[in-house]
Amino acid sequence: MISASAVKELRERTGAGMMACKKALSEANGDSEKAVEILREKGLAAAAKKAGRVASEGLVVAYVNEDGKSGAIAEVNCETDFVSANEDFKALAENIVKLAAKSNSNTVEELLEENYVDGSSKLKDVITALIAKLGENINLRRFTKFSNENGTIQSYIHGDGRIGVLVNLNADKISDEVHTLAKDICMQIAAANPLYLDETSVDQTALDKEREIYKVQALNEGKPEKIVEKMVEGRIKKYLKEVCLLDQVWVRDSDLTISKLVAKKSKELSAAISIADFVRFERGEGIEKKEENFAEEVQKQMQQSK
């Protein structure tokens, strides 16, 4: 028996119709992940990259040192948007990412043991104290940091901490134009959500899965088997252009890909420029959010403020 709540959740994840979701869940024996694949194979779930992303609250924050040689990005989560807008919570998030950028810690567990920015307590104890004060669970979910003595680090935060990007750019000459290029690349990543730098970094297992899905789609469309492989390879090429940063069309000029943009700027500035790495965080991606009645949520906040 497929529950209404399971159908509702699958519909929210994929955008497919109610009956299509119910049928997919039935075929998948209630397995929601398998149901997503079934819907994709039938062409009913167009937003594949969004599948599985359920909103959660908190902030994505970034910090780059003044010399532009190192920086960090972090996601700090809380339970409601009321707390994510709280000044104490925002200050905590900003201080966490500064600490991450300047410390030697490489894991969340290590960073939690670091002394807080004012040196008064360990980070984990500061978080615990704020939990007690605000009445919500707060946690440092993840962080990444880059350093580059032969280039520059740039960051971009979009939508009040909903999306954050950190870019590591190699450049043998640093100028305002190089910083602008790094910022443009950050905004490209925020908007177009690439999954990889280039084709050589694509996960082969993920690529094989895409290839199988495209094959099923083509067969479902009634295409002859002899041309299915050619269609699949064409769709794989299109997929790679969508998910590989260097192959993406630049959002500000459709005549340029990002690789061509970097080459163009390198020539104009007489500099050797290349993208070393990047990371993109989206608040709450992959985290299940507990649904609450809005009126009850407001009442809860009012009670906490008394």
From Swiss-Prot:
SUPFAM superfamilies: Elongation factor Ts (EF-Ts), dimerisation domain (SSF54713), UBA-like (SSF46934). It comes from the Bacteria. Pfam families: EF_TS (PF00889). One of its GO terms (molecular function) is translation elongation factor activity. Residues 80-83 are annotated as: Involved in Mg(2+) ion dislocation from EF-Tu. One of its GO terms (cellular component) is cytoplasm. Its main location: cytoplasm. InterPro entries: EF-Ts_dimer_sf, Transl_elong_EFTs/EF1B, Transl_elong_EFTs/EF1B_dimer, Transl_elong_Ts_CS, UBA-like_sf. Associates with the EF-Tu.GDP complex and induces the exchange of GDP to GTP. It remains bound to the aminoacyl-tRNA.EF-Tu.GTP complex up to the GTP hydrolysis stage on the ribosome. Belongs to the EF-Ts family. This is Elongation factor Ts. It comes from Clostridium acetobutylicum (strain ATCC 824 / DSM 792 / JCM 1419 / IAM 19013 / LMG 5710 / NBRC 13948 / NRRL B-527 / VKM B-1787 / 2291 / W).
